[in-house]
């Protein structure tokens, strides 16, 4: 897939498809549903975004230990909960109505990435069965 010229913004779906193709070696030949294919793309995108953030922030997410890591995730959850409260806890409705770049979807992505970091930390410690 051709890359966009400088100044052109790649659509999110195109980015995800490109990332999936780049990461095709990780996939099996078993057919996957559309939602699982999107999950695979998001995993690749999250790893890329976490890599970028690590260059700037290092491992500051766990600087204050497990309690700090938990509180960081809890703050993101609190932000999401506050945003869905006005939509009778309908997260899809809240997302449909809040299309801002810094809106609820951004908080969901941040929380997912924090949880990835926590999971990866625990896997790296060998303290959980994978």
Regions found by a protein language model. Name each.
Residues 2-130:
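Intrinsically disordered, low-complexity regulatory regions
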């Amino acid at each position: 897939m051709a890359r966009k010229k400088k100044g052109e913004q790649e659509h999110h779906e195109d980015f995800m498809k490109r990332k999936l193709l780049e990461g095709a070696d990780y996939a099996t030949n078993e057919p996957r549903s559309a939602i699982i294919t999107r999950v695979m793309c998001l995993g690749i995108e999250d790893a890329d975004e976490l890599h970028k953030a690590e260059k700037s922030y290092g491992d500051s997410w766990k600087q204050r230990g497990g309690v700090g890591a938990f509180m960081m995730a809890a703050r993101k959850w609190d932000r999401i909960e506050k945003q869905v409260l006005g939509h009778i806890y309908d997260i899809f409705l809240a997302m449909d109505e809040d299309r801002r770049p810094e809106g609820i979807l951004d908080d969901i992505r941040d929380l997912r990435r924090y949880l990835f970091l926590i999971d990866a930390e625990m896997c790296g410690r060998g303290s959980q069965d994978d």
